[in-house]
From Swiss-Prot:
Interacts with UQCRFS1. The gene is lyrm7. This is Complex III assembly factor LYRM7. Assembly factor required for Rieske Fe-S protein UQCRFS1 incorporation into the cytochrome b-c1 (CIII) complex. Functions as a chaperone, binding to this subunit within the mitochondrial matrix and stabilizing it prior to its translocation and insertion into the late CIII dimeric intermediate within the mitochondrial inner membrane. Its main location: mitochondrion. The lineage of its organism: Eukaryota, Metazoa, Chordata, Craniata, Vertebrata.
Length: 104
């Protein structure tokens, strides 16, 4: 797949992730839309394959962070906030171990 197709695919993926993550939050949806479009326009004339690859990696990392780390909260009362967890946020719980593993 050539770099142009990869860039377009990432652009679409970021916008789909934005719509999922910020569902029903018009301000956040608009801010994320503007930021995604702004970043892609800023680097529109980039020709270096190495730089394009670096930007694609960064964009992919941003999409993963948005999808797996952002939690949407809704104010229901003056002192209450309801968090809406998506399926992507519900990861396996891996217990933490203080003791270092012994190498054999």
């Amino acid at each position: 797949m050539d770099s142009r197709m990869k860039v377009l695919k990432l652009f679409k993926t970021l916008h789909r992730t934005r719509q999922c993550v910020f569902q029903n939050d018009c301000r956040a949806l608009e801010a994320a839309r503007r930021r995604i479009n702004e970043e892609f326009k800023k680097n529109k004339s980039e020709c270096s394959p190495a730089k394009i690859s670096e930007l694609l990696k960064f964009g992919t990392d941003v999409e993963i962070v948005l999808r797996t780390s952002v939690v949407q909260g809704i104010h229901t009362d003056s002192n209450k906030l309801v968090l809406q967890a998506r399926k992507d946020l519900l990861l396996d719980n891996i217990p933490f171990c203080d003791a270092p593993e012994k190498q054999t």
